[in-house]
């Protein structure tokens, strides 16, 4: 049996016995971030639990809720719509992809309830195009834009090409504005690490505003490097490349699972959402939104929120830990904060202008469910966060005590009219939030 699969099943099925017997004593640490003071309890202050949600689906007529806004189905009957991209012409591209488990990993997922959260199963491995030509909030055209992919996530139209980030490579294809499908031959411009226990498979993609560079997110293969750091080469990073795939370098490192990418309005500063580590207790470690500095290190796997050392990592690098950045905006522990979109549109009230909207896919490693919502982080016109994250789109949880949910938000994107789209990969719906 493949050793990686053995470790993976153990991670899903086992309990953190080391942690239960080695809880650290002492009060929480208080850490100042850009938006608030966050309290970090000692590792294993609470047990590490596995509380997977149970997806029930959306009844007819039921929808998430955003106070003061209208929420309607933009598209339904998709197959795990994971990420969204709006083309310069206003077409919506939906990446349909899912976590794929095989063999013992699949068996273990069913045993512990992981499969009931609707994150696993055959991956559609395609991109669907939605076109609302008359701008009435209902797409009239729905076509297969590109298929035969390998867990696609990041999408980009840039300099005459359509780019897609599969889990194992970045490809580009000749693109004609307004095309409803890709017909030309693709070119693989960058291989990406995806072998073995590919714990974090999403790869996002974004162009610098000046068009000279592309940025690619690559999450870690593991929780805290437990399979060996030889399996983490080129992972837990945001990579920078030229548009033809050449010139690869690490732009920022120590990011366990960076997913959302965006340049804050009013600046050329790159921001990302990061899924932090699991199995240290209910309130460790908070996911976060942070700006990225060229060459900066953000802690993984050695530390979190600056120099807070992870006790499970035995071969520490204290000099590197001293350099670890404290992230800007805490987003709650185990919320699985994924999608990121900045609002520059005309529709939402002024207080939402410039701010960040973040899709929180929801927890599995917490006693009570966290996430399962879209949150909003206010930003100044100069591109700086000004207040903590607040709930924006809620109602995804059906019964918290029973861990039942209607769906799970992931990717977010704004249409040209200023309305917000939210991909719900468990509900197989794209929601539209408008005024």
Positions of predicted regions on the chain:
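Blade-level signature of beta-propeller repeat domains, shared across WD40, Kelch, NHL, RCC1
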Residues: 413-435
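Residue-level detector of Asp-centered blade-edge/turn motifs that repeat once per structural unit
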Residues: 87-90, 157-159, 207-211, 264-267, ...
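Beta-propeller domain segments
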Residues: 22-66, 103-105, 122, 202, ...
